[in-house]
Amino acid sequence: MQFSLSIATAILAATASAMPVLETRQTVGTTANEFTSGGCKDVVLLYARGTTQAGNMGQEPGPELGNALKARLGAARVAVQGVAYSASLLGNLNPGGAPANEATSFRTLIGQVASQCPNARIVVSGYSQGAALVHRAVEGATAAVRARIAAGVTFGDTQKQQDGGRIPGLDASKTLIICNTGDRVCEGTLIITAAHSGYGARAGEAVDFIAARV
C-alpha cells in the first residue's frame, strides 16, 4: 500500500507539472470597483447602471460592455468602475432625467480620474437612467475634464431626444448613442417596452466605437 501510494503521488505531481498554466480571467459582474480599489489603467471605463439594477454595473449591458472592452484591449489595460447612485424609479422624474446631486457625484468621479490618471483614456457610459446621468455629469464638467473624455457611449438613452441626439459638452465624434428599434425611452417618453432590454447584445458595437478612440 505504501509503495502504491508513493507511485500515485509521483504520477499526480508529474501530471500537475505538465499541465499548462491558465491565465486568471478578470470578469466584470454586477459590481466593479477597479479604479477605486486598483487605481489607474490605460483606459478607465466609468459606467452608470439603469433604474433599479443591482450593484453599480447592473445586470446588462454594463458587464457585457466591461468584459468585451477587456477582451478587445487586454484586461491589464482596462479599469472598469461602476458609478454609485440610487438608480431609483423617481430619479427619472428629475429635470434632465437624473438627480442633480448624483450627477454631481459622477462628475466628481470623472474629475478624480482625470486628475489622478493623467495618461488614462476616460470612457463614460450608461444605460437608461444611467445614460441620463452621463449627460448631466458631462455637461457640467469643466472644459479641461471634458477634453480628457475619449468616448461617451449610452444605451437606451432617456435623454436622446431631449438633448438632440448628443451628450451636451462632448464632441459628436466622441459620442455614440445606441437605441434599439422601438425603444420608446429614446423617443422622449418613459414608456418601457421589450425593446428597452437586450442591450447586452450590442456591447460589441460600443466596443468597436471605443477601441477606435482610445
Curated annotation (Swiss-Prot):
The keyword Ion transport appears for this protein: no
TM region(s), chain numbering: none
Entry annotation: catalytic residues: 128 (nucleophile), 183, 196 (proton donor/acceptor)
Modification after translation (UniProt): The 2 disulfide bonds play a critical role in holding the catalytic residues in juxta-position; reduction of the disulfide bridges results in the complete inactivation of the enzyme.
Site (Transition state stabilizer): 129
Record flagged with keyword Hydrolase: yes
Signal peptide region: 1-18
GO MF assignments: cutinase activity
Reaction it catalyzes: cutin + H2O = cutin monomers
Entry's localization field: Secreted
GO CC list: extracellular region
GO biological process, one term: appressorium-mediated entry into host
Disulfide cysteine pairs (residue numbers): 40-117, 179-186
Major enzyme class: hydrolase
InterPro entries given in the database record: AB_hydrolase_fold, Cutinase/axe, CUTINASE_1, CUTINASE_2, Cutinase_monf
Keyword list, A-Z: Disulfide bond, Hydrolase, Secreted, Serine esterase, Signal, Virulence
Entry superkingdom: Eukaryota
Induction entry: Induced during infection; levels are increased during germ tube and appressorium differentiation, and during penetration.
Function: Catalyzes the hydrolysis of complex carboxylic polyesters found in the cell wall of plants. Degrades cutin, a macromolecule that forms the structure of the plant cuticle. Required for efficient penetration of the host plant cuticle by the appressorium during the initial stage of fungal infection.
Family under the similarity heading: Belongs to the cutinase family.
Official protein name in the record: Cutinase CUT2
